[in-house]
Curated annotation (Swiss-Prot):
Residue spans of biased composition, Basic and acidic residues class: 188-200, 302-318, 364-399, 427-550, 563-614
Organism: Mus musculus (Mouse)
Location (main, coarse): secreted
Modification after translation: N-glycosylated. O-glycosylated; contains glycosaminoglycan chondroitin sulfate and keratan sulfate. O-glycosylated with sialylated oligosaccharides which are predominantly represented by the monosialylated core type I structure, NeuNAcalpha2-3Galbeta1-3GalNAc, with smaller amounts of disialylated O-glycans.
Region (Disordered): 110-764
Position of the signal peptide: 1-24
An annotated GO BP: regulation of cell population proliferation
Domain SMB: start-end pairs: 26-69, 66-108
Known outcome of mutating R955A: Not cleaved by subtilisin-like proprotein convertase 4
Top-level division of the source organism's lineage: Eukaryota
Protein name as annotated: Proteoglycan 4
Length: 1054
């Protein structure tokens, strides 16, 4: 019986299976469907144009395209290893299949025109098309691209976002592929209409960048977000290039992302709308889209090529949910948006997905729809206005982004502005999230600020990136301050002309930034640039205008890379002079100081500006601009005089020197001057000059503002200023020197802080420059200002509030309202105001640098903390200590950072008032090898003698070691399980560490390659210092040779 039943069962089952197969075939297979017409109901299509629209069934290639024929292969992208090809460029290489003419020639030619429609696309279109084809082929590539763009963008933003966006984009790319193919089919069907539409669109496109922009923007909507995606598509085609540019830009500048945003913004807006709308509208859109689809198609054709490619990519991505289209899009979109937002920079990237997503829903159609819509919307328009749009092709957009912001001010009118507007608009939409985040990040502000300025300059792109990040923080605060005015003025004065116009728009925004920008570039960049420009030497010119640009640009560019951007040149122009030169000097010293100075430098530029004026004053000097500074320096007396006058009359000088004022700053002021630079911009605002002085002063206070953001810049400046001062003398050759410095600076800026080290020496000379304060040397400075002498004399035996090494190796001491750069071979640099350079309210409670690859520096003041990368404040700070360190409260008097070593996690010990200590263990991350670790620095405390003494002492204390060891081993063990930061209970220092003094005034972690964990740990108590053995939790007092004081050993005091 069993055997008989079996066949019956089988016979019953077979039909079911077959039916399923057939139905599945109908749904997702091309078996028996090759060449059938396009159907919107089908999950995937098998007509011979489905590849163009990326809507082919997975087995289309296997089932419907024979190897040696072009049947069904016209929209394939080129792939190696085939006997013959059918892509649009095969004729060029003589590898077309025999039946290419009958199947594909017409298709490719007709497409071209549409592509052509879009100017850029012309060539691109083919390419794009082919690319598109290719792209589709490798959604992966697309995805990657997307990721890349994201990465670029993200560089600034968090990698996490990046990941999410990439993943979304990649997954979407798959779906996208399918979906897009479907859409493609539609398009293809509608192709003819498309052509018309294309024309229409094209006109749009052509007619105005706007339209294109719009297109893009429109697209932006969908596309906008798309845009992001587009970049990926871009890759395929010209757009890619463009986009590439964009992305690059993006990469270069987060701003770009913004642009993306911009488009996005529209897009975003639209996207947002779209998303909502999408859902709702989606349906409509779908229909509408359909139409648009055709239009879109055309567009697609044209745009398509452009965008299409992008789109396709986008699409690909978006298609993610092939079907989900709607929902997916909606949802996706949203998420994307979110991402976008989060990413803020990534935005672009994300947007991409976002967009992509969105479009998908509509699927291509919506896109068109959107595209269209947005276009109309225009948000872009303004953008488009700018040429950007045209470029929009996509790439452009990003670019605009940058511009966007600055222009924003102007933007509106001016496309340049687009940026801002972009942001503005985009912002809104995008901001929706993205934007906002961005701003949140600061970036935005930064961008805003920075951006603006930057754009002003053209920097745009460059700034874009840098700008954003850096500016972020700085920017904002700074702007807070007078920034605004500054831009107005500062720039103005100097650039008066240039600036103004520039400012016209940017400036304003810039103002916000202006200063900042400069700082933003902050320091680094600025100097960097300056330097270079400086070399330019234009010194003189510099004052004239450069300055302006400089700030504008420098900042931006610099920020981007600072260094690089700088080169970009914006700076250059800037340097063009003046500034630069000064910076040069400054710069150099800065390097010396290096890092800090560097930042300083960056700052410097600003100061430079101030300086500039000074030079102005010095004018002749100007030539020596640096000299100016130099001059001051050179003529120490002169400078001093200047100083004084400056101080005295800062106003007058100010006017001229507004920046000069800087000078006054010199002594104490020096920092101020620095500030001034920063402020300077401010100043300009006011009266520019006159105000400057005044402002400047306030600046000090403002400084804090700045501080937050600007400060760093300020810092930089001051440092720079000082440095430059000194340097200047050295620099005498200003221009040349400048150039040299520039290199250094670049290096420094780049972080080549290493150069910094060498720099420090320069710095010291700077000290002389500090001349402002210390005309010839510290002591002198002191003499100059007897009232300040004690407070500004690091060697008076008073304990410092904080001592730390920046990531670039610079050793910095903070006490009261001043800080000093320390060098193993020279006396301390002249004092500079903490507020002016770092932008943090002084005096600080403590400072420490993490012992990890990033080497971020943290400043604690009351209930807030700031995080710096070398001397540039990170965006989004200050933050609350209680939130950033697991609930840490109380008055922190010192902090000791401990490196991760074997099973010991990275942590930081906070010493509190009253002899208590609290340990915070960082969240444990996988071990990674640091690339380009800190420069090896030979601090005087590393001398053999000191080590020997420590060893002897160690033997003496031997007995306690085991004991302590046991006491404390449990704590470290406890810590290692953390997967997030963990704050341990507060305990008495004596219960945790052996040999520690009751009062710890400061602590420092010094890099030392001779130690197993790479560091030496020291604690200071009044006039005594202790070497800390972390594993045994023992502190050993260091006995110094007779006549050697802590100041002599640590600060190299005379």
């Amino acid at each position: 019986m069993g055997w008989k039943i079996l066949p019956v069962c089988l016979s019953l089952l077979l039909p079911v299976v077959l039916i399923q197969q057939v139905s599945s075939q109908d749904l997702s297979s091309c078996a028996g469907r090759c060449g059938e017409g396009y159907s919107r109901d089908a999950t995937c299509n098998c007509d011979y144009n489905c590849q163009h629209y990326m809507e082919c069934c997975p087995d289309f290639k296997r089932v419907c395209s024979p190897e040696l024929s072009c049947k069904g292969r016209c929209f394939e992208s080129f792939a190696r290893g085939r006997e013959c090809d059918c892509d649009s460029q095969c004729k060029q290489y003589g590898k077309c299949c025999a039946d290419y003419d009958s199947f594909c020639e017409e298709v490719h030619n007709s497409t071209s025109p549409s592509s052509k429609t879009a100017p850029t696309p012309a060539g691109a279109s083919d390419t794009i098309k082919s690319t598109t084809k290719r792209s589709p082929k490798s959604p992966t590539t697309r995805t990657i691209k997307v990721v890349e763009s994201e990465e670029l963008t993200e560089e600034h933003s968090d990698s996490e976002n990046q990941e999410s966006s990439s993943s979304s984009s990649s997954s979407s790319s798959t779906i996208r592929k399918i979906k897009s193919s479907k859409n493609s089919a539609n398009r293809e069907l509608q192709k003819n209409p498309n052509v018309k539409d294309n024309k229409k669109n094209t006109p749009k496109k052509k007619p105005n960048p706007e339209p294109p922009a719009v297109d893009e923007a429109g697209s932006g909507l969908d596309n906008g977000e798309f845009k992001l995606t587009p970049p990926p598509p871009d890759p395929p085609t010209t757009p890619h290039s463009k986009v590439a540019t964009s992305p690059k830009t993006t990469a270069a500048k987060p701003v770009t992302p913004k642009p993306s945003l911009a488009p996005n913004s529209e897009t975003s807006k639209e996207a947002s709308l779209a998303s909502n709308k999408e859902t709702t509208v989606e349906t409509k859109e779908t229909t509408a889209t359909n139409k648009q689809s055709s239009a879109s198609k055309k567009k697609t054709t044209s745009v398509k090529e452009t965008r299409s490619a992008e789109k396709t990519s986008d699409k690909d991505v978006e298609p993610t949910s092939t079907t989900p289209k709607n929902s997916a899009p909606t949802t996706t979109k949203k998420p994307v948006t979110t991402t976008k937002e989060s990413k803020f920079l990534p935005l672009p990237q994300e947007p991409e997905p976002t967009t992509a997503k969105e479009p998908p829903p509509t699927t291509k159609k919506p896109e068109p729809t959107t595209r269209k819509e947005p276009e109309p919307t225009t948000p872009k328009e303004p953008e488009p206005t700018t040429p950007k749009e045209p470029e929009p092709t996509t790439p452009k957009e990003p670019e605009p982004t940058t511009p966007k912001e600055p222009p924003p001010t102007t933007k509106k009118p001016e496309p340049t502005t687009p940026k801002e507007p972009g942001p503005t608009t985009p912002k809104e939409p995008e901001p929706t999230t993205t934007k906002e985040p961005e701003p949140t990040t600061t970036k935005e502000p930064e961008s805003t600020t920075r951006k603006e300025p930057e754009p002003t300059t053209p920097k745009e792109p460059e700034p874009t990136t840098p700008k954003e990040p850096e500016p972020t923080t700085l920017k904002e605060p700074e702007p807070t301050t007078p920034k605004e005015p500054e831009p107005t003025t500062p720039k103005e004065p100097e650039p008066t002309t240039p600036k103004e116009p520039e400012p016209t728009t940017p400036k304003e925004p810039e103002p916000t930034t202006p200063k900042e920008p400069e700082p933003t570039t902050p320091k680094e960049p600025e100097p960097t640039t300056p330097k270079e420009p400086e070399p330019t030497t234009p010194k003189e010119p510099e004052p004239t205008t450069p300055k302006k640009p400089e700030p504008t640009t420098p900042k931006e560019p610099v920020p981007t890379t600072p260094k690089e951007p700088e080169p970009t040149t914006p700076k250059e122009p800037e340097p063009t002079t003046p500034k630069e030169p000064e910076p040069t000097t400054r710069k150099e010293p800065e390097p010396t100081t290096p890092k800090e100075p560097e930042p300083t430098t960056p700052k410097e530029p600003e100061p430079t500006t101030p300086k500039k004026p000074e030079p102005t004053t010095t004018s002749p000097k100007t030539t020596t601009l640096k000299a100016t500074t130099l001059a001051p320096k050179v003529t120490a007396p002169a400078e001093e005089i200047q100083n004084k006058p400056e101080e005295t009359t800062p106003a007058s000088e100010d006017s001229d020197d507004s920046k000069t004022t800087l000078k006054p700053q010199k002594p104490t002021k020096a920092p101020k001057p620095t500030k001034k630079p920063t402020k300077a911009p401010k100043k300009p605002t006011s009266t520019k000059k006159p105000k400057t002085p005044k402002t400047r002063k306030p600046k000090t206070t403002p400084s804090p503002l700045k501080t937050t953001s600007a400060t760093p810049e300020l810092n930089t400046t001051p440092l720079e200023v000082m440095l430059p001062t000194t340097t200047i003398p050295k620099q005498t050759p200003n221009p040349e020197t400048a150039e040299v410095n520039p290199d250094h600076e670049d290096a420094d800026g780049g972080e080549g802080e290493k150069p910094l080290i060498p720099g420090p020496p320069v710095l010291f000379p700077t000290a002389i420059p500090g001349t402002d304060l210390l005309a010839g040397r510290l002591n002198q400075g002191i003499n100059i200002n007897p009232m300040l002498s004690d407070e500004t004399n690091l060697c008076n035996g008073k304990p410092v509030d904080g001592l730390t090494t920046l990531r670039n190796g610079t050793l910095v001491a903070f006490r009261g309202h001043y800080f000093w750069m320390l060098n193993p071979f020279r006396p301390p640099s002249p004092p500079r105001r903490i507020t002016e350079v770092w932008g943090i309210p002084s005096p600080i409670d403590t400072v420490f640098t993490r012992c990890n690859c990033e080497g971020k520096t943290f400043f604690f003041k009351d209930s807030q903390y700031w995080r710096f990368t070398n001397d540039v404040v990170d965006p989004g700070y200050p933050k609350q200590i209680v939130k950033g360190f697991g609930g840490l409260t109380g008055k922190i008097v010192a902090a000791l950072s401990i490196a991760k070593y074997k099973d010991r996690p990275e942590s930081v010990y906070f010493f509190k008032r009253g002899g208590n200590i609290q340990q915070y263990t960082y969240k444990q991350e996988p071990m990674k090898k640091c690339t380009g670790r800190r420069p090896a620095i030979n601090y005087s405390v590393y001398g053999e003698a000191a080590q020997v003494r420590r060893r002897r002492f160690e033997r003496a204390v031997g007995p306690f070691q085991t004991h302590t060891f046991r006491i404390h081993y449990s704590v470290p063990m406890r810590v290692s399980y953390q997967d997030k930061g963990f704050l341990h209970n507060e305990v008495k220092v004596s219960t945790m560490w052996r040999g520690f003094p009751n009062v710890v005034t400061s602590a420092i972690t010094l890099p030392n390659i001779r130690k197993p964990d790479g560091y030496d740990y020291y604690a200071f108590s009044k006039d005594q210092y202790y070497n800390i053995d972390v594993p045994t939790r023992t502190a050993r007092a260091i006995t110094t040779r007779s006549g050697q004081t802590l100041s002599k050993i640590w600060y190299n005091c005379p």
